[in-house]
Amino acid sequence: MQTSNSESVSAALTEILRDDMNVDIRRVTRESRLIDDVGLDSVAFAVGMVAIEDRLGVALTEEDLLSCDTVGDLEAAIQAKVPSSPSGQ
């Protein structure tokens, strides 16, 4: 189901922001800008790329990250690369 997959990506991204990137997630929304609002820098992006690949099996490129302005954009970029499960499971 698309919703549960989306929710699972959202939950994992929240954990990555909190645990791996030391972001205070209480002040982060989907509309929060990654650099201006969340305060991510190049080191945080590198840590995030590794954590996303480790936890979700999704390899984002530097180009993918540069196209993301907000947390919601990042979530959508991850979601687009998450393999969809077979409908028959």
Swiss-Prot record:
**Keywords attached to this entry:** Cytoplasm, Phosphopantetheine, Phosphoprotein
Q: In which pathway does it act?
A: Siderophore biosynthesis; mycobactin biosynthesis
Q: What is its main location?
A: cytoplasm
What is the stated purpose of this protein?
Answer: Acyl carrier protein involved in the formation of acyl-S-ACP intermediates within the mycobactin biosynthesis process.
Q: How is it modified after translation?
A: 4'-phosphopantetheine is transferred from CoA to a specific serine of apo-ACP, leading to the activated holo-ACP form.
Q: Which cysteines form disulfides?
A: none
- Superkingdom, taxonomy of origin: Bacteria
Q: Which gene name belongs to this protein?
A: mbtL
Q: Which residues carry this modification: O-(pantetheine 4'-phosphoryl)serine?
A: 42
- Pfam families, sorted: PP-binding
Q: Does the keyword Lipid metabolism apply?
A: no
Task: Give the species.
Answer: Mycobacterium sp. (strain MCS)
Q: A Gene Ontology CC term for this entry? A: cytoplasm
Where's it found, cell-wise? Cytoplasm
Instruction: Tell me if Endoplasmic reticulum is a UniProt keyword of this record.
Output: no
Q: Which residues form the Carrier domain?
A: 7-82
Protein name per Swiss-Prot or TrEMBL: Acyl carrier protein MbtL
